[in-house]
Amino acid sequence: MDQKRLTHLRQLEAESIHIIREVAAEFSNPVMMYSIGKDSSVMLHLARKAFYPGTLPFPLLHVDTGWKFREMYEFRDRTAKAYGCELLVHKNPEGVAMGINPFVHGSGKHTDIMKTEGLKQALNKYGFDAAFGGARRDEEKSRAKERIYSFRDRFHRWDPKNQRPELWHNYNGQINKGESIRVFPLSNWTELDIWQYIYLENIDIVPLYLAAERPVLERDGMLMMIDDDRIDLQPGEEIKNQMVRFRTLGCWPLTGAVESNAQTLPEIIEEMLVSTTSERQGRVIDRDQAGSMELKKRQGYF
């Protein structure tokens, strides 16, 4: 294929499909992480293209914290059914028994137990040797220096000082028993690329990405959308209906909305063209401490 004759989106598409096929051919038990967000939707679309007209040769895995938006759960189940995907859902049973709650225990402990430990449990349970993730290098500085094939030791830990060279699109997937590789096919995409590709390919997304009038309250400098009744209002707090949308999706108490009137994909793309902030500014878990994402990845987080 002559890369010079492709548009930049088609070049990114071709690179991602190549990576996905490489992993399917090289590893014995791969899995695709499915977090239900826009990046997961693009990655799933690319995987379906990679093996069309066949079915995916690996399952989808959702590590459930119990605190995702209701619209996300509905979208997850509807998508898996529509595409005939095998969907594995894992929730940390110890965390459930402990009643881990982001309001009570804080974002750090909630993320560590329900996400990081939950993910490691699922990978160990099913014996996956490679796991696709939708992370991109433009999102956050620790992700910017991570390889497409990200080596993890038998404890699922990432060592940024022990990364493998990736020259001329050659990826080293050699691992010993118990070790694994996290694979990021969207590493070279930007947030704008993602939205332009979603528009180009007419990819279905969670409606929360589009602006609508939603019940929110302001807490700690973040617009929190109230998705159910598991919240205690603090003195002086008031729930108001505002036109908001989400640039990134996660657990609803830990994911901030942004004021917006962008109700269509072209309007979102217009916003992205003038945006000067990262989409992850709305993630509470990224504010825990300096270098918090790198620390989480060292501990086994995606």
Swiss-Prot record:
CDD domains the record matches: Sulfate_adenylyltransferase_2
Listed name of the protein: Sulfate adenylyltransferase subunit 2
Enzyme class: transferase
InterPro entries, sorted: PAPS_reduct_dom, Rossmann-like_a/b/a_fold, SO4_adenylTrfase_ssu, Sulfate_adenylyltrnsfr_sub2
EC number: 2.7.7.4
Gene behind this protein: cysD
NCBIfam families listed in its UniProt record: CysD, PRK05253.1, PRK12563.1
Pathway: Sulfur metabolism; hydrogen sulfide biosynthesis; sulfite from sulfate: step 1/3
Record has Ubl conjugation as a keyword: no
Keyword line: ATP-binding, Nucleotide-binding, Nucleotidyltransferase, Transferase
GO biological process: hydrogen sulfide biosynthetic process; sulfate assimilation
Stated role: With CysN forms the ATP sulfurylase (ATPS) that catalyzes the adenylation of sulfate producing adenosine 5'-phosphosulfate (APS) and diphosphate, the first enzymatic step in sulfur assimilation pathway. APS synthesis involves the formation of a high-energy phosphoric-sulfuric acid anhydride bond driven by GTP hydrolysis by CysN coupled to ATP hydrolysis by CysD.
Originating species: Enterobacter sp. (strain 638)
Molecular function in Gene Ontology: ATP binding; sulfate adenylyltransferase (ATP) activity
